[in-house]
Each structure stands twice: as structure tokens, then as C-alpha cells.
């Protein structure tokens, strides 16, 4: 954000919303001098309606000579956030757990059959007299 504020230093407002994590509990909205609730909340509303997380949306606004009023500001920030999200590449990631397990060599075929069916990411594997595998498994589907 500091980079954007420096780049657009002559703008009147740099309003934003962000959300981290999947539970929606870690977020922040900022109106940067606009009337309370007219900038950050509409931006955050677009983040929520698109079901996004681990995201920051910053809207830079220049004063164009016409006062927009409360509803005009809300609509302008909402539309700007909607536009940027519609034209952004959304990257989907899964939440994974890393598990490690050890088993006797005699069980290798059974273990590998299950791994082949479930197709987790194999992080590390070692096959000696006893075997060990570290897997990254998606927490939910």
C-alpha cells in the first residue's frame, strides 16, 4: 500500500479493505477520510460477495470537482472494487495438512494403492527396511 500511496501521492483518498484466512474473522476496512462506511465497507462487500480470502483491494480516488454524496461514494467504491475483481486473475489454493507416517516394508503395496487412489502430493518418501512417507493432503473438498 505504501508503494501505491507513493505512486498516487496526489490522489485525495486511498481506501481499502483486506481479508486474511478462511473464516472471515481477520479483516480490515479503511475509508481514508471519506465519510464513515462509504469506501472500505463497499470494497469489503465485494471481497465477501466474491468469496475471496488473502486479498487486499485498494481504490485510489481523485476529486473530480463534483461531490458524490454518501450514496454516490458507496456506489463508486463498490463499482471500482467489482471492476477490479472482475478483471483480476483469481488464484485458487487449497488448505492442506502435512502428515508423516511410518510402516513396514511388507505394507508398501497396500499403502501405495491408497496413495494412488487419493493422489496426495508426496513431499518425501524413504523405502528401507521400514518405510516413511510425508504427504500433503487437502483438508476438505
Regions found by a protein language model. Give the residues of each.
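Short glycine-/aliphatic-rich beta-strand segments at the starts of folded cytosolic domains
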Residues: 90-105, 133-135
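Terminal, non-globular segments
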Residues: 135-137, 141
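N-terminal positively charged helical leader segments and presequences
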Residues: 127-131
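Short amphipathic alpha-helix segments
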Residues: 102-120, 141
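Conserved mixed alpha/beta catalytic, RNA-binding, or beta-rich assembly cores of soluble enzyme
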Residues: 36, 40-49, 60, 73-77
Amino acid at each position: 500500500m505504501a508503494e501505491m500511496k507513493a505512486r498516487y501521492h496526489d490522489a485525495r483518498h486511498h481506501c481499502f479493505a483486506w481479508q486474511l484466512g478462511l473464516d472471515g474473522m481477520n479483516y480490515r476496512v479503511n475509508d481514508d477520510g471519506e465519510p464513515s462506511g462509504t469506501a472500505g465497507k463497499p470494497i469489503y462487500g465485494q471481497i465477501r460477495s466474491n468469496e475471496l480470502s488473502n486479498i487486499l483491494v485498494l481504490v485510489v480516488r481523485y476529486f473530480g470537482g463534483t461531490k458524490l454524496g454518501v450514496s454516490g461514494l458507496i456506489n463508486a467504491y463498490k463499482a471500482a472494487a467489482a471492476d477490479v475483481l472482475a478483471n483480476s486473475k483469481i488464484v485458487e489454493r487449497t488448505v492442506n495438512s502435512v502428515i508423516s507416517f511410518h510402516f513396514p516394508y511388507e505394507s508398501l503395496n497396500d499403502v501405495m494403492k491408497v496413495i494412488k487412489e487419493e493422489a496426495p502430493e508426496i513431499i518425501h518418501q524413504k523405502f528401507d527396511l521400514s518405510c516413511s512417507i510425508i504427504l500433503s493432503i487437502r483438508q476438505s473438498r
